[in-house]
From Swiss-Prot:
<comment type="function">
    <text>Component of the adaptor complexes which link clathrin to receptors in coated vesicles. Clathrin-associated protein complexes are believed to interact with the cytoplasmic tails of membrane proteins, leading to their selection and concentration. Required for many aspects of development and behavior, including negative regulation of vulval differentiation. Required for the dendritic localization of potassium channel kvs-4 in the cholinergic motor neuron DA9.</text>
</comment>
<keyword id="KW-0966">Cell projection</keyword>
<dbReference type="Pfam" id="PF01217">
    <property type="entry name" value="Clat_adaptor_s"/>
</dbReference>
<dbReference type="GO" id="GO:0030121">
    <property type="term" value="C:AP-1 adaptor complex"/>
</dbReference>
<dbReference type="GO" id="GO:0035615">
    <property type="term" value="F:clathrin adaptor activity"/>
</dbReference>
<dbReference type="InterPro" id="IPR036168">
    <property type="entry name" value="AP2_Mu_C_sf"/>
</dbReference>
<comment type="subunit">
    <text>Adaptor protein complex 1 (AP-1) is a heterotetramer composed of two large adaptins (gamma- and beta'-type subunits), a medium adaptin (mu-type subunit AP47) and a small adaptin (sigma-type subunit AP19). Interacts (via N-terminus) with kvs-4.</text>
</comment>
<dbReference type="GO" id="GO:0009792">
    <property type="term" value="P:embryo development ending in birth or egg hatching"/>
</dbReference>
<dbReference type="InterPro" id="IPR001392">
    <property type="entry name" value="Clathrin_mu"/>
</dbReference>
<dbReference type="GO" id="GO:0097500">
    <property type="term" value="P:receptor localization to non-motile cilium"/>
</dbReference>
<keyword id="KW-0653">Protein transport</keyword>
<dbReference type="GO" id="GO:0002119">
    <property type="term" value="P:nematode larval development"/>
</dbReference>
<dbReference type="InterPro" id="IPR022775">
    <property type="entry name" value="AP_mu_sigma_su"/>
</dbReference>
<dbReference type="InterPro" id="IPR018240">
    <property type="entry name" value="Clathrin_mu_CS"/>
</dbReference>
<dbReference type="GO" id="GO:0040025">
    <property type="term" value="P:vulval development"/>
</dbReference>
<dbReference type="Pfam" id="PF00928">
    <property type="entry name" value="Adap_comp_sub"/>
</dbReference>
<keyword id="KW-0968">Cytoplasmic vesicle</keyword>
Amino acid sequence: MATSAMFILDLKGKTIISRNYRGDIDMTAIDKFIHLLMEKEEEGSAAPVLTYQDTNFVFIKHTNIYLVSACRSNVNVTMILSFLYKCVEVFSEYFKDVEEESVRDNFVVIYELLDEMMDFGFPQTTESRILQEYITQEGQKLISAPRPPMAVTNAVSWRSEGIKYRKNEVFLDVIESVNMLASANGTVLQSEIVGSVKMRVYLTGMPELRLGLNDKVLFEGSGRGKSKSVELEDVKFHQCVRLSRFDTDRTISFIPPDGAFELMSYRLTTVVKPLIWIETSIERHSHSRVSFIIKAKSQFKRRSTANNVEIIIPVPSDADSPKFKTSIGSVKYTPEQSAFVWTIKNFPGGKEYLLTAHLSLPSVMSEESEGRPPIKVKFEIPYFTTSGIQVRYLKIIEKSGYQALPWVRYITQNGEYEMRMK
């Protein structure tokens, strides 16, 4: 059984440690590992062997890392798996918790161990007692700072004792703001989603709440799911969230403050399909007038509706005598903004509306030298999230066992939402 190379990967498939033993495989082939694994999971296959061209990946998952042996054909998979598990056992003798952070902290020790444990792809010394005679360097262990007793810290300092309500209710809002900059030809140049989970809590006593999100949601560093998974970045929690519980099983468990607060915030860097797309056609007439044809198109599902849509179209600063015609909504010229604003109270999904505008333009040359600011769009879409995040459950646990009503609402709104004009 000859191993060509060894890899330790994080849960996104990124290489943390790599060791090439035989030089007979393409080391970049490991980049295909995570994609192959996702495909197998979608098919329902759980075999610990993946194949890409003439390279086999034999792997195990331990905590939040993958240990992968890359081999050519005709290998004893059982022996390789046994060796990988032995690696975990030996590593734990040096730095106790074998996980992504400790692997990064102890990469020097790991490289020394891999060199001693395997020679030209064949296992050699795997007994930790013997290895410790050769490799005496101590690993860096992950140490959790001891916590002071709850009585000293007043562990629930954010909530008072003795709170009472005649009607027990919880309101939870998932609010996502879409930041986007698109070119005039429809290419999304920059996009991100900035989200927050806001709560209003009116509950008696000292309740514990448990919040579960849908399975497609991943937290940064927590791992990887299928190709349609959503990974939240820059996640920040309110101090009431039990981080130890979250680190263990990703359950968001907390004793909430009374009243309104932000439970968590997050960011999602992804290519966002424009929810409302604006096409513009501009035509100048004999250096004295300019005409705009504006087409607004909603590109979200028909069952959703955007409310209070405002489309702000910039015009030359000296434009005047505006005339507008639109199939829906109202249009107002705002010279202080050097723009006209098209307002549509309700904009259903899958719809397309048209606006034409004619303005006098005393000095066309100045308009050309100014350049054109981007079109800005404001909107709010209830019962909808761009990321696909959903609340799967919100449990309320209180020792008196009272019934409480949880209300969940989703809102997607504009952030910096801009489109350049031709």
